[in-house]
């Protein structure tokens, strides 16, 4: 029997062979991607060669996600399960599935020892994740589908390489004193490190049980005012009361467009979400983002088939 025949096809094949009936067409491999970024990468690379199911919808929080009965049903018949790793989704540590489970981020960035699991915000890491997803898919796809997978992988990696160049130009357009990213919690350290941006995660280390004390507010206000920041960036369209307090204390506005740090934005993909985030940051810090270039990157990504 073909070693790469998906689990979902084995029973049907046995029945048909037992009956001596017509030849059977193997079912597609079943792939489950836990979060939205990996889901988009897996869907793009797999094209029509595999059935890809996404567990966390756009806008969902991977940190607090809990498996639903329908998720467990998909996992029970999966050939491959993909999650970022690094503790991004704690529930992913206890997956019950007969398929192979791959912590894509941990494989792609094996030397990372920090505390920020959002590794894909660095396009170089995202390109490495594409390669890991491709290798994982190759292990469950029939041999006949692998040449096309390799072609799609090469195109996808090229897009993320171009994304890195594009992002570098956007941040380089800002004066060095304005390359500052003020957010609530550490989410963009990988992006900040790649492009020499100062990330200030205001609430990390300054809150107790989620409560911002007056002394902490004073410290945050001083740090933000001295940073060169022009804007505070929120993770949702409705900023929290805490962020509004900080905005009032610092005199800095909260960006009208939120940053999407936990996955992909609704109606967008991994690449267009990345360009949206970068344009939001650059424009908020007084720069002007290259939207035409962003649109071109997105067009290249969605054309991968």
Language model features with spans:
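Bacterial N-terminal signal peptides
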Residues: 9-20
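Bacterial N-terminal signal peptides that target proteins for export
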Residues: 1-11
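Extracytoplasmic metal-acquisition and chelation regions
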Residues: 26-305
